[in-house]
């Protein structure tokens, strides 16, 4: 074979490989000129992040995957996922038959009745044909691979408990009409992760963007949820916690939002809360286009040790937003408190209610670290690039 022909085949094969290469998840850009960033600091020690310190320094994390189930904090800390079950390796990125899933697919594993710890044999983009209704006692663990759920309906947690979702890039989720056998019926919402009537849920180190509705929504009596170490970007209505002002079943909702990075291109609802109890701890917020934290129907919101970096738009400096049918006199009684938060570039939090309300202590789900620590290292959030036999 001539040298020219050989070179042509090399170019053809290289182009073919690049055409089907799976793009990497986005990473956090430098915070700003006003916030120091030191990317050389150890990410596994994480300056007091108890979740990451629990497992990321372990060079044998691949062989000790289930240790992750001991690392949750906050209201979702009791979620064990699939720790009591066997490992199941996803080998097939397809979703050809949602009613009768093919063995080896994520849908096949996630819908089994028994506990399972689900891992993946390679990088893959999973384009679902129907939203995936995950069964109880499942861990979906994408560590070690670039696993994406995208370009179709995404994940639904409906009347389940003990779910751990870790290290997935979830993006470009859209609504679809559910099949006739779906227990939910109608259309899926187009959320990245929809949580209905579920409890003991932990979502950690995920990257989420560009979905039709919310990135993560929890409604209809869902409770005991932790959303941590995740990177959210490029979205309008980010996170809804509580179904409606009239739905009293969400009064016992408890959610912890911790160590996340709410990044570029976000507009509102980080989160938007109703009725329940919400502990928002050690997150970084930057450049929200309307507001960061909002709510209605008398939620208790405890914002602790966060960094809020406002944009240069003079009309979007406020962190908070209340939606009240009866005006200021109603929301002034709601217990919203900021403690140890750092406000950058004119950001401000409007508190309300009783400064010393016992509800803050009762529903404090974890110990906050000083907000200043969030500014000493580059945020280590979202999907991680974990290598075998190395600390992650």
UniProtKB/Swiss-Prot annotation:
Name the chain's protein: Putative pectate lyase 21
Catalytic activity as recorded in UniProt: Eliminative cleavage of (1->4)-alpha-D-galacturonan to give oligosaccharides with 4-deoxy-alpha-D-galact-4-enuronosyl groups at their non-reducing ends
Q: Per UniProt, where does Ca(2+) bind?
A: 189, 213, 217
Q: Look up keyword Calcium and say if it applies.
A: yes
Co-factor: note: Binds 1 Ca(2+) ion. Required for its activity.
Hey, which family's this protein in? Answer: Belongs to the polysaccharide lyase 1 family.
Glycosylated residue positions: 38, 220
Which biological process, per GO, is one annotated for this protein? pectin catabolic process
Q: Does the keyword Calcium apply?
A: yes
* Signal peptide interval: 1-21
**What InterPro entries does the record point to?**
AmbAllergen (IPR018082), Pec_lyase (IPR002022), Pectin_lyas_fold (IPR012334), Pectin_lyase_fold/virulence (IPR011050), PEL (IPR045032)
User: What are the leading ranks of the lineage?
Assistant: Eukaryota, Viridiplantae, Streptophyta, Embryophyta, Tracheophyta
- Which SUPFAM superfamilies does the record cross-reference, listed alphabetically? Pectin lyase-like (SSF51126)
Q: Which cofactor does it need?
A: Ca(2+)
Q: In which pathway does it act?
A: Glycan metabolism; pectin degradation; 2-dehydro-3-deoxy-D-gluconate from pectin: step 2/5
């Amino acid at each position: 074979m001539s040298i020219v022909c050989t070179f042509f085949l090399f170019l053809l094969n290289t182009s073919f490989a690049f055409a089907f290469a799976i793009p990497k998840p986005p990473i956090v850009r430098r915070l700003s000129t006003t916030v120091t960033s030191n990317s050389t600091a150890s990410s596994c020690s994480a300056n007091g992040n108890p979740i990451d310190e629990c497992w990321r320094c372990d060079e044998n994390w691949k062989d000790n995957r289930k240790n992750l189930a001991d690392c949750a904090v906050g209201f979702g800390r009791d979620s064990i996922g699939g720790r009591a079950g066997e490992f199941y390796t996803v080998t097939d990125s397809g979703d050809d038959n949602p009613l009768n899933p093919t063995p080896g697919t994520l849908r096949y594993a996630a819908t089994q009745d028994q506990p399972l710890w689900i891992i993946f044999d390679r990088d893959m983009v999973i384009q679902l044909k129907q939203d995936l209704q995950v069964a109880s006692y499942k861990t979906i663990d994408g560590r070690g691979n670039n696993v994406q759920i995208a370009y179709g309906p995404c994940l639904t947690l409906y009347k389940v408990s003990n779910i751990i979702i870790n290290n997935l890039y979830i993006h470009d989720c859209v609504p679809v009409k559910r099949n006739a056998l779906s227990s939910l019926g109608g259309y899926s919402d187009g959320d990245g992760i929809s949580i209905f009537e579920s409890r003991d849920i932990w979502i950690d180190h995920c990257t989420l963007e560009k979905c039709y509705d919310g990135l993560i929504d929890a409604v209809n009596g869902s409770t005991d949820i932790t959303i941590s170490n995740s990177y959210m970007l490029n979205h309008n209505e980010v996170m809804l916690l509580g179904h409606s002002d009239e739905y009293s079943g969400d009064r016992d909702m408890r959610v912890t939002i911790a160590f996340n990075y709410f990044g570029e291109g976000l507009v509102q609802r980080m989160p938007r809360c109703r009725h329940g109890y919400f502990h928002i701890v050690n997150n970084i917020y930057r450049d929200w286009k309307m507001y960061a934290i909002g709510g209605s129907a008398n939620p208790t919101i405890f914002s602790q040790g966060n960094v809020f970096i406002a944009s240069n738009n003079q009309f979007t400096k406020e962190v908070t937003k209340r939606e009240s049918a009866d005006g200021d006199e109603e929301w002034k009684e709601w217990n919203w408190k900021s403690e140890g938060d750092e406000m950058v570039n004119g950001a401000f939090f409007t508190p309300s209610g009783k400064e010393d309300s016992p509800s803050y202590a009762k529903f404090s789900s974890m110990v906050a670290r000083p907000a200043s620590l969030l500014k000493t290292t580059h945020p280590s959030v979202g999907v991680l690039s974990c290598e075998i036999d190395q600390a992650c």
